[in-house]
A protein has these predicted regions:
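Accessory carbohydrate-recognition regions in carbohydrate-active enzymes
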Residues: 1-167
């Protein structure tokens, strides 16, 4: 058995860049949430956005609808407890790529499973800000980081009121 199959986390925020998971928590109401097997939607009032997602067997489409004008961020983490993940951004192709080596959680616990989960995130907006991070340290303009714990990439872009962003 393997852990997380090389998962990653994609988080949207508005107005302030918060990279660490414990700092980007936000309030939500289940009354503002819709969940079906084919669609998920939630309104995040503190982030001034609605996040929507639909999926296929190996991909997903995210739509973020911003309720007011300002600066929006997407934060992406390779979820590697062992600090073996890697992530990079290609700003010309408007693409974020990464991988996360998978480790066993039952027989042979902690040993490498022999494969990695890979991910690609395509975005459409022109960026006004991007970089990498490790823990609370930001590295503006840096395009790749890897093989350490609590790493990721952030991208920032300007949005207009009621603008929708597809990822």
């Amino acid at each position: 058995c393997t852990q997380d199959y090389g998962s990653m986390t994609l988080t949207a925020s508005f107005d302030s860049l918060r990279c660490l998971p414990e700092k980007r928590t936000t309030r939500l109401s289940h009354e503002q949430e819709t969940a079906t097997p084919a669609y998920y939607s939630v309104t995040l009032p503190d982030e001034h956005l609605q996040a929507e997602m639909t999926g296929r067997s190996r991909s997903a489409i995210f739509r973020f609808s911003y309720q007011k004008e300002g600066k929006a961020y997407l934060i992406v983490n390779p979820n590697s407890d062992e600090g073996e993940g890697y992530i990079e951004i290609d700003t010309l192709q408007k693409r974020i790529y990464g991988y996360n080596p998978v480790h066993r959680i039952y027989q042979g616990w902690g040993e490498p499973a022999g494969y990695s989960g890979h991910f690609i995130i395509d975005y459409q907006k022109d960026l006004c800000d991007f970089g990498t991070f490790r823990e609370d340290s930001l590295f503006p303009g840096q395009t790749k980081i890897g093989h350490e714990k609590n790493i990721g990439i952030y991208i920032g872009f300007h949005v207009k009121s009621h603008e929708q962003v597809l990822v």
